[in-house]
Swiss-Prot record:
Keyword Nucleotide-binding among UniProt keywords: yes
Native organism taxonomy: Bacteria, Bacillati, Bacillota, Bacilli, Lactobacillales
PROSITE patterns: ATP_GRASP, DALA_DALA_LIGASE_1, DALA_DALA_LIGASE_2
Protein residues bound to ATP: 162-217
Catalytic activity: 2 D-alanine + ATP = D-alanyl-D-alanine + ADP + phosphate + H(+)
Superkingdom field: Bacteria
Protein name as catalogued: D-alanine--D-alanine ligase
Cofactor list: Mg(2+); Mn(2+)
Predominant localisation class: cytoplasm
GO CC annotation: cytosol
Organism this protein belongs to: Streptococcus equi subsp. zooepidemicus (strain MGCS10565)
Length: 348
């Protein structure tokens, strides 16, 4: 039986490229090589596509993957050269230019099936402010928030925020993930500084009410027939679950399933599936919730390309549901092919 060619894109132009490399390495080691032939391409910070490694069998545990030594500039190609008839692309890319609809549009122009959400749902979910407004229309509970857009009167925004929210608040670039550029503010001075920091990553800034809450996550998988996992909990050993805690200091553990009552579990899964459909998603997503001390549930965000590292919540959630990492990848490829055929059919 001939193998399916799977093309992995990793790296990327965003500040989350290091997470992409970690995710791609984990995917490479989890793939079932009896079913897939794998080609990998690195996207540099300046947007160059560089052909890196190919594997027809399981790489040795000692073999170094996705390292600088595997990236040779003389292997640079035109982006369109990744095209291969019948291949499926797995864009293991996080953040802007990865999960905001950009790479999805490029792959649709190339007429290639790809893992993950489509152009529209990727771009909607990437922008935290737009996501908030879409989820409001679906009657999904969220924490109170205000918005600052670069060029607006900052002092007026500070006054409006203090009138609506109470400290602490969290300040987030609208178009970043992996906690990049996010700050906690407990005073007007800190809020001003946090907004200025966030503006170095994006021109649209979300300011959210801080809540004393547990962080609960639900995995989603499917196209029109989306399925959800039991919720898992991010158990933090730090005050704020930032990029350093997530990916460098490893200051978190996962509790799967989360120790919450059945009613909260059911509500979160229902909200997650509703949110997935509200943004028109397909393939996969991870839905993140806050569970307040009073039992109130708030949907925090939808992540359309969640982390795929060996310690990331998304693959662990599905493993708990009985779907191994290798089986998860196989199902994602199947869903990609299904959506590709549907898209192509709509063009006829």
């Amino acid at each position: 039986m001939s193998k399916q060619t799977l093309i992995l894109l990793y790296g990327g132009r965003s500040a989350e490229r290091e997470v992409s490399v970690l995710s791609a390495e984990s995917v490479m080691r989890a793939i079932d090589y009896t079913k897939f032939f794998v080609k990998t391409y690195f996207i540099s910070q300046t947007g160059q596509f560089i052909k890196t490694q190919e594997f027809s069998s399981q790489p040795a545990a000692t073999e170094r993957l996705m390292t600088n030594a595997t990236i040779r500039l003389e292997q640079q190609i035109r982006p369109s050269d990744i095209y291969e008839e019948g291949a499926v692309v797995f864009p293991v890319l996080h953040g802007p230019m990865g999960e905001d609809g950009s790479i999805q549009g490029f792959l649709e122009v190339l007429k290639m099936p790809y893992v993950g959400t489509n152009i529209l749902s990727s771009s909607v979910a990437m922008d935290k402010i737009t996501t908030k407004r879409v989820l409001e229309s679906a009657d999904i509970p969220q924490v109170a928030y205000t918005v600052y857009i670069e060029g607006q009167d900052l002092d007026r925004c500070l006054a409006e925020t203090e009138a609506v929210l109470s400290y602490p608040v969290f300040v987030k670039p609208a178009n970043m993930g992996s906690s990049v550029g996010i700050s906690k503010a407990e005073s007007e001075e800190e809020l001003r500084a946090a907004i200025l920091l966030a503006l170095t990553y994006d021109s649209r800034i979300l300011i959210e009410q801080g809540v004393l809450a547990r962080e609960i996550e639900v995995g989603l998988l499917g196209n029109t027939d989306v399925k959800s996992t039991l919720p898992g909990e991010v158990v933090k050993n730090v005050d704020f679950y930032d990029y350093q805690a997530k990916y460098i200091d490893n200051e978190i553990t996962m509790a799967i399933p989360a120790a919450i009552d059945e009613s909260a579990m059911t509500s979160m899964r229902t909200y997650a599936e509703t949110a997935f459909k509200a943004i028109g998603a397909c393939g996969l997503s991870r839905c993140d919730f806050f569970l307040g001390q009073d039992g109130q549930i708030y949907l925090n965000e939808l992540n359309t390309m969640p982390g795929f590292t060996q310690w990331s919540m998304y693959p662990l959630l599905w493993e708990h549901m009985g779907l191994s990492y290798a089986e998860l990848i196989e199902e994602l490829v199947r869903l990609a092919q299904e959506m590709f055929e549907k898209r192509e059919g709509h063009l006829i």
